[in-house]
């Protein structure tokens, strides 16, 4: 490989891995992709690169591993920065803190509520759906009239973090019986705008493939444990 050796360890449905790949693609950084079977036999490379958490994604840059998706995105933004390269986080300390705040909020709220729309049933599922819709409404208000969360010209880390969940929307909507567009139409416009960017559209996993995998998991769970 070239002097800049960049390797990404990932599991294809992961929203956390997707944002790392999008960050690299947005900055036009060449990298080698290595798929990990996180539910099967984890590779020695993953266990050596992330011995504490043993999780994906991992970015290996010139032999040095960087772990945790948002930390990786910030690392990418700091290492590959010049006048020609998109900046994913602002240089102003306050604006940067706000970017981190929203990225962290998305991972805490969207991930948890979305997951419970298909792992829970009855009242708990309804509560999860409402929480999911409410956090999307909060994010829609934060977006306001901007094209992207990062402004009108380019995406930011917040955009990459939130759009990384989009491939899961189909699963959550179908199983939960609701429509994101019915509740947050402007946010869906933002999603469509993001998907016009090649770096984003080619980096996201297939929503139907995710749905198939989730339904398989549900069937296995029902067979062994019931619901």
From Swiss-Prot:
Lineage of the species this protein comes from: Eukaryota, Viridiplantae, Streptophyta, Embryophyta, Tracheophyta
Species, as recorded: Arabidopsis thaliana (Mouse-ear cress)
Entries under CDD domains matching the protein: GST_C_Tau, GST_N_Tau
Sample GO molecular function, one term: glutathione transferase activity
SUPFAM superfamilies cross-referenced by the UniProt entry: GST C-terminal domain-like, Thioredoxin-like
Name listed for the protein in its UniProt record: Glutathione S-transferase U27
InterPro entries, A to Z: Glutathione-S-Trfase_C-like, Glutathione-S-Trfase_C_sf, Glutathione_S-Trfase, Glutathione_S-Trfase_N, GST_C_Tau, Omega/Tau-like, Thioredoxin-like_sf
Intracellular or extracellular location(s): Cytoplasm, Cytosol
Function: May be involved in the conjugation of reduced glutathione to a wide number of exogenous and endogenous hydrophobic electrophiles and have a detoxification role against certain herbicides.
Keyword check for Cell inner membrane: no
Top-level lineage group: Eukaryota
Its EC number(s): 2.5.1.18
Residues in GST N-terminal domain copies: 4-84
Signal peptide: none
GO BP terms, alphabetized: glutathione metabolic process; toxin catabolic process
């Amino acid at each position: 490989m070239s002097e800049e050796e960049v390797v990404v360890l990932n599991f294809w449905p992961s929203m956390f891995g997707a944002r790392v790949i999008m960050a690299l693609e947005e900055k036009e950084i060449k990298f080698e992709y290595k798929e990990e079977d996180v539910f099967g036999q984890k590779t020695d490379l993953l266990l050596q690169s992330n011995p504490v958490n043993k999780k994906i994604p991992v970015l290996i840059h010139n032999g040095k591993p960087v772990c945790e998706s948002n930390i990786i995105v910030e690392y990418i933004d700091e290492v590959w920065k010049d006048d020609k390269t998109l900046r994913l986080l602002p240089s102003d300390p306050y604006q940067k803190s706000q970017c981190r705040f929203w990225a962290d909020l998305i991972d805490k709220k969207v991930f948890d509520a979305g997951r419970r729309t298909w792992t829970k049933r009855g009242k708990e599922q309804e509560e999860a759906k409402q929480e999911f819709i409410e956090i999307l409404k909060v994010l829609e208000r934060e977006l306001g009239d901007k094209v992207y969360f990062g402004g009108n010209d380019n995406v930011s880390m917040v955009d990459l973090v939130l759009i990384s969940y989009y491939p899961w929307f189909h699963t959550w909507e179908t199983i939960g019986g609701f429509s994101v567009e019915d509740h947050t139409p402007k946010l869906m416009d933002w999603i469509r705008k993001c998907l016009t960017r090649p770096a984003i559209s080619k980096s996201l996993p297939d929503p139907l493939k995710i749905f198939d995998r989730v339904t398989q998991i549900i069937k296995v769970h029902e067979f062994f444990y019931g619901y």
